[in-house]
Amino acid sequence: LMINYIDRGAIATAAPLLQDELQLSPSEIGWVLAVFYWAYAPLQPVMGWLADRIGPAIVLAAGFALWSLSTAATGLVWGLASLVVLRLLMGAGEATFYPSALSLLVRNVPPTQRALATATMQFGAVLGPDIGTLVGGMIMLHFGWRTMFVVMGCASLTWLFFWRRRLRAERESQASSAVAA
């Protein structure tokens, strides 16, 4: 959760520089900040349905890849249209998080430990913007806003390397369920 909040908040850190370089009006930068939620909110139930069908670890990995790549690609935008498309894609990718993460939590954490697990997960939502603003600001200061997005998106993708183990376990579980049926 911390990683998606770091990536999600990067746009606010970069907004003044981005607005200046891309010559966006205040209302256009407002669109850029809001459009993320146009995909994020309505797609959460869809992603929950999808996680129930093909597995939450797989859906989360796909969403994670989409939002990380969207973050990295934001460093390559050329104007309002490309920025809006990437923010929509990022919203779609991040819409996978809550349904998938909560499904995984319920499946893997005993009922007596779920409150702590949920609180620990939510801690990332609080800590992520703080870390993202600090680290993103330092990267922007030294290398510019474009580099900040590329670095943050690519750094987020490294999480998938560690998530592979979880994906293997979910595929094996699905295969054994299919054989048993």
Regions found by a protein language model. Name each.
Residues 42-78:
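Conserved MFS/SLC helix-loop-helix module at the cytosolic interface between two early adjacent transmembrane helices
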Residues 86-126:
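Cytoplasmic helix-loop-helix junction between adjacent transmembrane helices
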Residues 1-26, 47:
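Extracytoplasmic
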Residues 121-170:
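Helix-loop-helix hairpin linking two adjacent transmembrane segments in secondary transporters
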